[in-house]
Amino acid sequence: KRPIPANAVAVTFDDGFTNNFTDAAQILDDIGVPATFYITTGMIGTNQMFWVDQLETCINLSTKKNIEVCLGDNRQIFQVGSYKDKVNSLNVIKTFCKNIHKDKKDLIVENVISETGVFPNSKQSLNYRVLTWNEVKQMNTNPLFSFGGHNVTHDTLSYLNHDEAVEQISGSIN
Protein backbone atom coordinates (compact mmCIF):
# COMPACT_ATOMS: atom_id res chain seq x y z
CA LYS A 1 0.00 0.00 0.00
CA ARG A 2 1.09 3.53 -0.73
CA PRO A 3 0.61 6.38 1.72
CA ILE A 4 -2.15 8.82 0.85
CA PRO A 5 -0.71 12.16 -0.32
CA ALA A 6 -1.52 15.21 1.80
CA ASN A 7 -3.39 16.84 -1.08
CA ALA A 8 -5.49 13.78 -1.99
CA VAL A 9 -9.19 14.13 -2.70
CA ALA A 10 -12.00 11.63 -3.23
CA VAL A 11 -14.51 12.34 -5.97
CA THR A 12 -17.95 10.98 -5.10
CA PHE A 13 -21.46 11.34 -6.45
CA ASP A 14 -24.61 10.80 -4.47
CA ASP A 15 -27.98 9.24 -5.37
CA GLY A 16 -27.49 8.08 -8.97
CA PHE A 17 -28.74 10.85 -11.20
CA THR A 18 -28.48 10.40 -14.96
CA ASN A 19 -26.09 13.35 -15.29
CA ASN A 20 -23.52 11.14 -13.54
CA PHE A 21 -23.54 9.12 -16.78
CA THR A 22 -24.21 11.82 -19.39
CA ASP A 23 -21.86 14.48 -18.00
CA ALA A 24 -19.61 13.48 -15.11
CA ALA A 25 -18.43 10.06 -16.31
CA GLN A 26 -17.26 11.41 -19.67
CA ILE A 27 -15.37 14.32 -18.11
CA LEU A 28 -13.78 12.13 -15.44
CA ASP A 29 -12.77 9.54 -18.02
CA ASP A 30 -11.27 12.23 -20.28
CA ILE A 31 -9.05 13.56 -17.49
CA GLY A 32 -8.36 10.18 -15.86
CA VAL A 33 -9.93 10.92 -12.47
CA PRO A 34 -11.42 8.00 -10.52
CA ALA A 35 -14.76 8.41 -8.78
CA THR A 36 -17.21 6.50 -6.64
CA PHE A 37 -20.94 6.68 -7.36
CA TYR A 38 -23.25 5.98 -4.42
CA ILE A 39 -26.56 4.95 -5.93
CA THR A 40 -30.04 4.65 -4.48
CA THR A 41 -30.79 1.25 -5.92
CA GLY A 42 -34.57 1.27 -5.57
CA MET A 43 -34.79 4.31 -7.83
CA ILE A 44 -32.47 3.10 -10.61
CA GLY A 45 -34.32 2.32 -13.81
CA THR A 46 -37.54 4.03 -12.73
CA ASN A 47 -39.11 7.33 -13.71
CA GLN A 48 -39.62 8.12 -10.05
CA MET A 49 -38.26 11.24 -8.44
CA PHE A 50 -36.86 11.54 -4.93
CA TRP A 51 -39.30 13.11 -2.49
CA VAL A 52 -37.22 16.27 -2.20
CA ASP A 53 -37.14 16.66 -5.98
CA GLN A 54 -40.90 16.19 -6.14
CA LEU A 55 -41.36 18.99 -3.60
CA GLU A 56 -39.00 21.29 -5.49
CA THR A 57 -40.71 20.62 -8.82
CA CYS A 58 -44.19 21.17 -7.42
CA ILE A 59 -43.36 24.41 -5.67
CA ASN A 60 -41.09 25.78 -8.40
CA LEU A 61 -43.66 25.12 -11.14
CA SER A 62 -46.66 26.25 -9.09
CA THR A 63 -48.50 29.30 -10.37
CA LYS A 64 -50.34 29.77 -7.08
CA LYS A 65 -49.59 32.55 -4.62
CA ASN A 66 -49.90 30.27 -1.58
CA ILE A 67 -50.53 26.67 -0.62
CA GLU A 68 -51.82 25.07 2.56
CA VAL A 69 -49.69 22.20 3.85
CA CYS A 70 -50.15 20.06 6.93
CA LEU A 71 -46.83 19.61 8.75
CA GLY A 72 -47.56 17.20 11.55
CA ASP A 73 -50.55 18.54 13.46
CA ASN A 74 -50.16 22.06 12.07
CA ARG A 75 -51.80 23.29 8.88
CA GLN A 76 -49.70 26.12 7.53
CA ILE A 77 -50.11 28.58 4.69
CA PHE A 78 -46.95 28.88 2.61
CA GLN A 79 -46.37 31.78 0.26
CA VAL A 80 -45.11 30.49 -3.11
CA GLY A 81 -45.78 33.44 -5.40
CA SER A 82 -42.22 34.72 -5.74
CA TYR A 83 -38.85 33.02 -6.10
CA LYS A 84 -37.91 34.08 -2.56
CA ASP A 85 -41.22 32.73 -1.21
CA LYS A 86 -40.66 29.42 -2.98
CA VAL A 87 -37.14 29.07 -1.55
CA ASN A 88 -38.28 29.92 1.98
CA SER A 89 -41.29 27.58 1.82
CA LEU A 90 -39.21 24.74 0.41
CA ASN A 91 -36.64 25.12 3.17
CA VAL A 92 -39.28 24.85 5.89
CA ILE A 93 -41.08 21.90 4.30
CA LYS A 94 -37.88 19.99 3.43
CA THR A 95 -36.42 20.52 6.90
CA PHE A 96 -39.61 19.18 8.48
CA CYS A 97 -39.70 16.19 6.11
CA LYS A 98 -36.09 15.24 6.82
CA ASN A 99 -37.05 14.60 10.43
CA ILE A 100 -40.04 12.28 10.05
CA HIS A 101 -40.80 8.72 8.97
CA LYS A 102 -41.22 7.96 5.28
CA ASP A 103 -44.97 7.31 5.56
CA LYS A 104 -45.63 10.78 7.00
CA LYS A 105 -43.26 12.34 4.48
CA ASP A 106 -45.15 10.68 1.62
CA LEU A 107 -48.40 12.23 2.89
CA ILE A 108 -46.83 15.68 2.90
CA VAL A 109 -45.53 15.22 -0.64
CA GLU A 110 -49.03 14.16 -1.75
CA ASN A 111 -50.45 17.20 0.04
CA VAL A 112 -48.04 19.52 -1.82
CA ILE A 113 -48.86 17.85 -5.15
CA SER A 114 -52.57 18.35 -4.49
CA GLU A 115 -52.17 21.95 -3.33
CA THR A 116 -49.95 23.05 -6.21
CA GLY A 117 -51.76 21.08 -8.91
CA VAL A 118 -48.35 20.09 -10.28
CA PHE A 119 -47.79 16.38 -10.86
CA PRO A 120 -44.00 15.96 -10.89
CA ASN A 121 -42.21 13.58 -13.18
CA SER A 122 -38.64 13.30 -14.35
CA LYS A 123 -39.56 14.56 -17.84
CA GLN A 124 -40.39 17.98 -16.36
CA SER A 125 -37.05 18.16 -14.62
CA LEU A 126 -34.35 16.29 -16.49
CA ASN A 127 -31.82 17.11 -13.75
CA TYR A 128 -33.84 14.83 -11.47
CA ARG A 129 -33.87 11.79 -13.76
CA VAL A 130 -32.12 8.76 -12.26
CA LEU A 131 -29.74 6.35 -13.93
CA THR A 132 -30.90 3.23 -15.73
CA TRP A 133 -29.33 -0.14 -14.96
CA ASN A 134 -27.86 -0.13 -18.47
CA GLU A 135 -26.09 3.18 -17.73
CA VAL A 136 -24.78 1.77 -14.44
CA LYS A 137 -23.48 -1.32 -16.27
CA GLN A 138 -21.75 0.82 -18.90
CA MET A 139 -20.09 2.97 -16.23
CA ASN A 140 -19.08 -0.15 -14.32
CA THR A 141 -16.91 -1.28 -17.26
CA ASN A 142 -14.64 1.71 -16.65
CA PRO A 143 -11.85 0.82 -14.18
CA LEU A 144 -11.83 4.43 -12.94
CA PHE A 145 -15.32 4.08 -11.51
CA SER A 146 -16.61 2.20 -8.50
CA PHE A 147 -20.06 1.97 -6.98
CA GLY A 148 -21.35 1.95 -3.45
CA GLY A 149 -24.77 1.46 -1.95
CA HIS A 150 -26.57 4.53 -0.69
CA ASN A 151 -29.72 2.80 0.44
CA VAL A 152 -32.76 1.51 -1.42
CA THR A 153 -35.13 4.50 -1.37
CA HIS A 154 -33.13 7.35 0.19
CA ASP A 155 -35.07 7.30 3.45
CA THR A 156 -33.48 8.76 6.56
CA LEU A 157 -32.34 5.66 8.43
CA SER A 158 -32.64 7.18 11.89
CA TYR A 159 -36.41 7.53 11.40
CA LEU A 160 -36.93 3.90 10.37
CA ASN A 161 -37.35 0.95 12.68
CA HIS A 162 -34.50 -1.57 12.88
CA ASP A 163 -35.90 -3.98 10.28
CA GLU A 164 -36.64 -1.17 7.81
CA ALA A 165 -33.13 0.24 8.24
CA VAL A 166 -31.52 -3.17 7.72
CA GLU A 167 -33.57 -3.65 4.53
CA GLN A 168 -32.52 -0.21 3.25
CA ILE A 169 -28.84 -1.00 3.77
CA SER A 170 -28.71 -4.66 2.76
CA GLY A 171 -31.13 -4.12 -0.12
CA SER A 172 -28.88 -1.49 -1.63
CA ILE A 173 -25.94 -3.88 -1.64
CA ASN A 174 -27.80 -6.87 -3.05
Set out the residue ranges of the language-model regions:
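Catalytic alpha-helical scaffold of carbohydrate-active enzymes acting on polysaccharides/glycoconjugates
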Residues: 1-174
